[in-house]
Design a protein with these regions (language model features):
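Extracytoplasmic/secreted proteins, especially bacterial periplasmic and envelope-associated proteins
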Residues: 31-38, 55-66, 133-140, 174-178, ...
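Active-site-adjacent substrate-binding region
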Residues: 73-74, 190, 199-299
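A non-catalytic alpha/beta surface segment that caps or lines the substrate-entry region
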Residues: 34-95
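Solvent-exposed loop/turn segments at secondary-structure junctions
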Residues: 46-47, 77-80, 94-95, 106-110, ...
Length: 299
């Protein structure tokens, strides 16, 4: 009989455990928070502030390129406006043909029409929560995905020109609509749009377009929330919301919208600032999405 040294036995046990159980990478809410800080520092990411938008665009692209070489910036023109959607792909290791899209808008609203101070009505929002938080979550997901390859392909998509709805008769989700038109070949198996997800009192009900057209995916996400014991999901119904998920739903795709509702009282005001954002809320929504990603080869 050959005697195995205790140190070697311990190492073998560790390796054996690693082989039988996969620990998903963890989402870092503090890192996500720092991405919001950076965006706010650039200034409003609205059509009225092209320099801030260019800085933010390059910041997103350069961060993504640290983690994948599959990054594209797609220019488009709609309603006389120019925009850019950013698309990063992380190929799956086991089932690359199965695709999961995670999306968020990266622009901010060019006015604060709900501000209590009438002098601010034409002032662009800072967009820390509405715009900044979704981008922050996607950028931290990109980092997390490099630690353990996803079993299925993940697409992170940053949509431009989402937040122009009801301004000069413009619709919401212009960039997402253009993305669907330009990439008609793209048919992800599932998709999640996240919006306004950093409030310290984050509460996400079941958005009604999502419930009507993608109920199973919505229930899958709520089940993960229960599994992780997060407190950001409500079993109550929300309302029908115009957001970046709708162009995908209209094209027959299985996409849901995770959004804080009722909207915070600083929504579309100059008070949508970094002090409204919470690292724990970012951690909770981020870890739910990460868990969803790593479960896809089992569903």
């Amino acid at each position: 009989m050959k005697i195995i040294p205790l140190s070697l036995l311990f190492l073998l046990l560790i390796c054996s455990n690693w082989g039988f159980s996969q620990v998903n990478p963890e989402f870092d809410g503090s890192r996500a928070f720092s991405h919001i800080e950076k965006q706010v520092l650039f200034g409003p990411r609205s059509i009225t502030h092209p320099n801030s938008k260019n800085l933010t665009h390059d910041y997103i692209v350069n961060n993504l390129k640290r983690y994948t070489d599959k990054v594209t910036s797609q220019e488009f023109t709609a309603y006389g406006l120019s925009g850019r959607n950013i698309w990063a792909t992380f190929p799956g290791e086991k089932s690359p043909d199965i695709r999961l899209m995670i999306g968020a808008h990266w622009d901010t609203r060019p006015q604060s029409e709900l501000d209590e101070n009438k002098a601010n009505l034409k002032t662009p929002t800072s967009g820390a929560n509405d715009g900044g938080s979704g981008v922050a979550v996607l950028l931290e997901l990109a980092r997390a995905l490099t630690f353990d390859k996803s079993p299925t392909t993940v697409d992170l998509v940053f949509f431009d020109l989402e937040d122009l709805g009801n301004i000069d008769d413009l619709p919401f989700a212009i960039g997402a609509s253009e993305f669907v038109k330009k990439n008609s070949f793209y048919r992800p198996n599932k998709g999640v749009i996240i919006d306004m997800v950093c409030d310290e009192n984050l509460l996400i009900p079941k958005e009604l377009y999502s419930k009507k057209y993608s109920r199973q995916l919505l229930e899958e996400i709520w089940s993960i929330g229960e599994e992780l014991n997060v407190n950001i999901f409500s079993d109550k119904d929300g309302t029908f919301i115009q957001d970046d998920h709708l162009p995908f739903i209209r094209s027959g795709l299985n996409v849901v919208n995770l959004i804080h509702y009722p909207f915070p009282d600083y929504w579309h005001t100059t008070r949508d600032t970094i002090d409204k954002c919470d690292k724990e809320s970012l951690s909770q929504i981020g870890n739910v999405i990460l868990t969803l990603i790593y479960k896809q080869d089992k569903t």
